[in-house]
């Protein structure tokens, strides 16, 4: 299946409103308004998810997947502009799995559901903070399903937050310790084994690199939550060494928040450049 850039650039125009296409039967029984768009809420395997319907779906049904924090900083992310371009916007909550094998299995069913709806085989992912962990884990497990990744202050180290140094916000250390216990339980290892776990994104760059999945990452130099030196700096170095593709937007004076950009158009442009039109 092929897209052409002109088709997506026309999404939302009168030309699109007159084009006939098969109706999509969305999952779930609840439809709500979300930033002026129609959002279809559903449950899968007892977990909540949603699909936001673009006013005029583009040919081939391209889609954008927010891995985590789907309600955070939405206008600063690519989500709304991509909806106007005809992309569907989707989310599936697997946060408490930290994308262990159970989480991957849920997302595999989610992906099959999207394919049954006729969506394009590859989506583009947004991974903010913990969403980076989910995005990179999914892309490593199923690189054939990912066209590109926009990452933002991403978690790349399963053992993140365990370091005790001046860069880590003191008020977050207790929370990090509790989170580490949960992550260790999810992966069935000891806390001290999290950083060296073979599925930690820092240690599992090769599938993403070999698939040449393009990544655009916002790095925040003053981040005291997800320390760049233990996360994206390690990940990007190893990814490049493995032949991967990553572009870093370095914001040396920014902290962990806010995610996204005042004008998210550069993020949209990155996605449109790398979606398989």
Give the predicted meaning of each segment.
Residues 98-118, 137:
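Alpha/beta-hydrolase active-site loop
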Residues 127-137:
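Glycine-rich nucleophile elbow surrounding the catalytic serine of serine-hydrolase chemistry
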Residues 170-233, 237-240:
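The feature captures the conserved acid-bearing segment of alpha/beta-hydrolase catalytic domains
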Residues 73-90:
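Short amphipathic alpha-helix adjacent to the substrate-entry channel of hydrolases
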Residues 118-129:
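Alpha/beta-hydrolase fold nucleophile elbow
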Residues 137-191:
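Hydrolase active-site cap/lid region
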Residues 5-59:
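N-terminal cap/lid segment of alpha/beta-hydrolase-fold proteins
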Residues 225, 230-277:
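C-terminal catalytic histidine-bearing segment of alpha/beta-hydrolase fold enzymes
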């Amino acid at each position: 299946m092929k897209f052409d850039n002109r088709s997506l650039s026309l999404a939302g125009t009168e030309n699109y409103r007159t084009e006939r296409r098969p109706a999509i039967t969305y999952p779930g029984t609840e439809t709500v308004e979300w930033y002026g768009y129609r959002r279809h809420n559903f449950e899968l395997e007892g977990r909540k998810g949603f699909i936001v319907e673009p006013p005029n779906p583009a040919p081939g049904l391209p889609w954008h997947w927010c891995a985590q924090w789907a309600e955070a900083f939405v206008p600063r992310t690519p989500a709304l502009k991509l909806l106007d371009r005809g992309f569907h916007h989707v989310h599936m909550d697997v946060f408490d799995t930290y994308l262990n094998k159970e989480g991957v299995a849920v997302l595999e069913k989610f992906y099959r559901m999207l394919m049954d709806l006729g969506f394009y085989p590859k989506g583009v992912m947004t991974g903010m903070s913990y969403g980076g962990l989910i995005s990179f884990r999914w892309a490593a497990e199923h690189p054939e399903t990912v066209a590109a990744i926009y990452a933002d202050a991403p978690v790349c180290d399963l053992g993140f937050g365990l370091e005790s140094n001046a860069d880590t916000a003191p008020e977050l250390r207790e929370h990090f310790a509790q989170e580490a216990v949960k992550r260790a339980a999810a992966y069935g290892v000891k806390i001290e084994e999290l950083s060296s776990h073979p599925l930690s994104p820092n240690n599992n760059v090769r599938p993403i690199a070999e698939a040449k999945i393009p990544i655009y990452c916002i790095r925040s130099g003053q981040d005291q939550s997800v320390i760049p030196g233990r996360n994206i700096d390690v990940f990007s170095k190893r990814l490049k060494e493995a032949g991967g593709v990553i572009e870093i937007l370095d914001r040396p004076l920014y902290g962990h928040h806010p995610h996204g950009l005042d004008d998210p158009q550069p993020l949209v442009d990155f996605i449109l450049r790398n979606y398989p039109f």
